[in-house]
C-alpha cells in the first residue's frame, strides 16, 4: 500500500514518539525525509539521524532531543499537502513565532529553513513549521 503523504507521516511519527518520550523513531527513508531531518539536526531540534537497512528498503532513524525531560519540538505542523501545495516567494516566506521557530522550505537549491531561503533570495514550497 502506498502512502499519500510521506512527509506528513514522518512528522506524525516524530510528534508521536516525542509525546511517548521515545529516544528514537524509525521510518521508511527518502531523499526529502533525509533533507528535512538534516535541517532539523542543523537547527538543534533532533540529536542525529542515520539511514540504515538495505538498498531496496532504506530506513531513517532519528534520535530525538529532550531538554530537562521536555521535548525540544513543541509543535510540528505540515504546511503544504499533496492536494494543496503552499508556495511562497522570498518576500512572503512565513516567520514562525516571530523567528523563534522555523519553516522548512523546499527551494530550487534544496531544502532549507525560511531564514536561509530569505538570505539566499529563494522562495519555494513551505513543507512544515517547527517550534
UniProtKB/Swiss-Prot annotation:
GO molecular function term, any single one:
rRNA binding
Q: SUPFAM superfamilies under this entry?
A: Ribosomal protein S8
Q: Which GO terms describe its cellular component?
A: ribonucleoprotein complex; ribosome
The cross-references to InterPro entries, in alphabetical order and at most eight, read: Ribosomal_uS8, Ribosomal_uS8_CS, Ribosomal_uS8_sf
What biological process terms from GO does the record include? translation
Q: Which UniProt keywords apply?
A: Ribonucleoprotein, Ribosomal protein, RNA-binding, rRNA-binding
Q: How does it assemble?
A: Part of the 30S ribosomal subunit. Contacts proteins S5 and S12.
What family does the entry list? Answer: Belongs to the universal ribosomal protein uS8 family.
What is the annotated role of this protein in its UniProt record? One of the primary rRNA binding proteins, it binds directly to 16S rRNA central domain where it helps coordinate assembly of the platform of the 30S subunit.
Instruction: Tell me the PANTHER family matching this sequence.
Output: 40S RIBOSOMAL PROTEIN S15A (PTHR11758)
Q: Tell me what this protein is called.
A: Small ribosomal subunit protein uS8
Give the gene name.
rpsH
